[in-house]
Amino acid sequence: MDLNFFKQTRILDGGMGQELLARGMEPNGTLWSANALLHEKYHQLLLDTHLDFIKSGAEVIVTTTFTTRKIRLKDNNVEDKYEYLNIKAGEIAQKAKKKYPKTLIAGGLPPQYLSLIHI
């Protein structure tokens, strides 16, 4: 990766969770965008949303992993899906990148409070 890329202002994608809801994804507890990973019926919607962000000018897309931390998953009774959800988020982002190879993928991390300390 050319680190000079980040010496200029770059455009990232937008708020994925709200966009997925606006496009018809049903809310599921406090999973937000992780709900699109959990249910295969939303995988295409998630991919299409990544692609639309890219078409709108995003140079970097962020994986939908903001709410895939263990404590959030436990609160929603899907803690056993931790690995699957994080892998699936990367796979779907990679599909978008395959169509637009110049796009970069960033991993989405939640705020530190009650997130990474429980991994």
Set out the residue ranges of the language-model regions.
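N-terminal binding-site loop/beta-alpha segment at the start of enzyme catalytic domains
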Residues: 9, 15-48, 55
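Hydrophobic faces of well-ordered beta-strands that scaffold small-molecule active sites
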Residues: 10-13, 61-63, 105-107
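Conserved, mostly hydrophobic/aromatic
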Residues: 14, 53, 93
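Active-site beta-loop-alpha junctions enriched in small/polar residues
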Residues: 16-17, 66, 108-114
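Glycine-rich, proline-tolerant flexible connector loops at the mouths of alpha/beta enzymes
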Residues: 30-41, 54, 60-85
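Alpha/beta enzyme core
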Residues: 51, 55-56, 100
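Alpha-helix-loop-beta-strand connector modules within alpha/beta enzyme cores
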Residues: 77-100
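Conserved small/polar residues in nucleotide/adenosyl-binding loops
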Residues: 117-119
